[in-house]
Every structure is written in structure tokens, then in C-alpha cells.
UniProtKB/Swiss-Prot annotation:
Name recorded for this polypeptide: PKHD-type hydroxylase NE2125
Database matches in InterPro entries: Oxoglu/Fe-dep_dioxygenase_dom, PKHD_C, PKHD_hydroxylase, Pro_4_hyd_alph, Pro_4_hyd_alph_FE2OG_OXY
Keyword Metal-binding: yes
Organismal lineage: Bacteria, Pseudomonadati, Pseudomonadota, Betaproteobacteria, Nitrosomonadales
Organism for this UniProt entry: Nitrosomonas europaea (strain ATCC 19718 / CIP 103999 / KCTC 2705 / NBRC 14298)
Chain sites annotated for binding Fe cation: 97, 99, 160
Amino acid sequence: MLLTIDDVLTQEELAIARSMLARSAWVSGLVTAGTQAAQVKNNQQVQENDPQIVNLRRLVLGALNRNALFFTATLPEKIVPPFFNRYSGETNHYGFHVDNAMRLLPDGSGYVRTDVSATLFLSDPQEYDGGELVINDTFGQHGVKLQAGSMVIYPSSSIHQVTPVTRGERLACFMFIQSMVRNPDQRRLLYEMDMALLQLRQNIGETPAVVSLTGTYHNLLRQWADS
């Protein structure tokens, strides 16, 4: 399931994030690339030991924690601490690749299974040319270029790329989520059911039928969630 989520960050949070990024130390994006990705990755990211990264991660994770749509779409069990990247000048693209199935946590404490990948845009589209996130799925190819503060989520199994940035600078945050429900089809059905229940509550209230369907949703989640 490919889904965009608007206004994950407030304008104030976005300004704070960009201010911190302006003071950050940048290194080659190859530091987090797998064997295949290293052949096509040409960008920069914030250095792991940079003093800004703790506050940047806290800001993003705090925004995700209050976002109900992010929760219902991903059903997060674990989130790899977010990374921050930059595309500009000579380090301006990331060719087609697939994300590693398992990601080592930055502190080396263990691995997280990548079920869902997410990109949070930190630059507005008019600030740069190119830089589309292009995602392939069973329905074709999708180009995504969102307003700053908005996010796209998609299955980590998807082949995707970032096209060359030919003008300006593209700042973004990317992360990987291990979902409570690893099967993407089951996760999509639960999301669609939750959205339908939300609409029913708005239209007719908490009727006995809505309560019953809510119970069915939670029973399915109970059945499909990893034990």
C-alpha cells in the first residue's frame, strides 16, 4: 500500500528541523547502503554522531506518535531511528534499489525487520528540480514529490529510486518500520476497515453494528499480529 500523509510536521517543527539540518555535519549516504544499493546511491546524510541527530529524531518521532493516520496505516511495532538525507550538486540521486529486509539499529543493539519504508519531505517542491521518489508496484510506476512536512509510506519490498536533483537542494527524512502485521495485504485490509469505521462513526455514530464491526477489526488484528 502506497499512502501519502499531509502535514506530519507543523510549520514550526519544519522550521526547527531545517535549522538543525543547516548546522549538521554531512557524510556520504553510502554509510547506510547495502551491497546492491551502494552501486547506485549518491547522496549525503547527517553523520550518526552529529549532536543534532538526537533532537531531529525526537522531533520526527514525536510528530509520528500523535499522527493517527500513520499509526493505522503502518501499525508500528518498531521504528528504526530516522535518518536525514540531502540531494544536491554532485551528490544528487539514488538509482533503483530495494531496501534491505533487516536493518541494524544505529547503536548496534539489534535488527529490525523492514515492512514499511517512509520518506518525510523537508524541502518544498519549488525549491528543487528533479528529486522525485519513484516507486514501482504491481499497478505501475508512481512519482512522489510532496510539500515539506508531508510523508509517503510504501512497502519496503518495493523497488524505488530518487531521480537526479538538477537544481536546488532536496532535504528529507527516511525511516523503516517493523509492523505488528507483517503481511502487506492484511495490513491494507485493516487500514481500509479502520477508515470505513471512522466514516461510519461520523455518519451514524456508535451504533450496535459499528461496535460489532469494531470488534471484528480488533479480532482480526489480534489474529494477524505477530505474537
